Amino acid sequence: SGSCEVKTCWWAQPDFRAIGDYLKDKYDSASEMVVEKHRESRGWVETLRAKYALFKPPTERDLVYYENSPNFCEPNPETGSFGTRDRMCNVTSHGIDGCDLLCCGRGHNTRTEKRKEKCHCIL
């Protein structure tokens, strides 16, 4: 009588929240770059260089950018953004739906509604 052993190995995807937190950290610490053009024997070559020399240069695993994000507060047909003016916001939220962020420093109006409705209750 013989015995067999089966060994199975697989890669598991990390927790979605962990991935989001990791990407947010990378985004928050992204390095701004500038494009430099210089001539070499094979023609013009473009390279990226850190915009601010006082910061350490980014590694291969760091996130870099060379264009600023568009302003999503104001309407912009080029980017397809409708802006945030007249949008509903959540006064108690500190997230992306919060008035502080969504209103882009323009302030906000608070509206209180009082409704009287029949509840069709049977007692």
From Swiss-Prot:
Disulfide bonds join 89-104. Gene3D superfamilies: 3.30.2460.20. It holds the Pfam family wnt. GO terms for cellular component: extracellular space. GO terms for molecular function: cytokine activity; frizzled binding. A lipid is attached at residue 1 (O-palmitoleoyl serine). Keywords: Developmental protein, Disulfide bond, Extracellular matrix, Glycoprotein, Lipoprotein, Secreted, Wnt signaling pathway. InterPro entries: Wnt, Wnt_C. Its main location: secreted. Disulfide bonds have critical and distinct roles in secretion and activity. Loss of each conserved cysteine results in high molecular weight oxidized Wnt oligomers, which are formed through inter-Wnt disulfide bonding. Palmitoleoylation is required for efficient binding to frizzled receptors. Depalmitoleoylation leads to Wnt signaling pathway inhibition. GO terms for biological process: canonical Wnt signaling pathway; cell fate commitment; neuron differentiation. Glycans are attached at residue 90. It is found in: Secreted, Extracellular space, Extracellular matrix; Secreted. It comes from the Eukaryota. Belongs to the Wnt family. Ligand for members of the frizzled family of seven transmembrane receptors. Functions in the canonical Wnt signaling pathway that results in activation of transcription factors of the TCF/LEF family. Required for normal embryonic mesoderm development and formation of caudal somites. Required for normal morphogenesis of the developing neural tube. This is Protein Wnt-3a. The gene is WNT-3A.
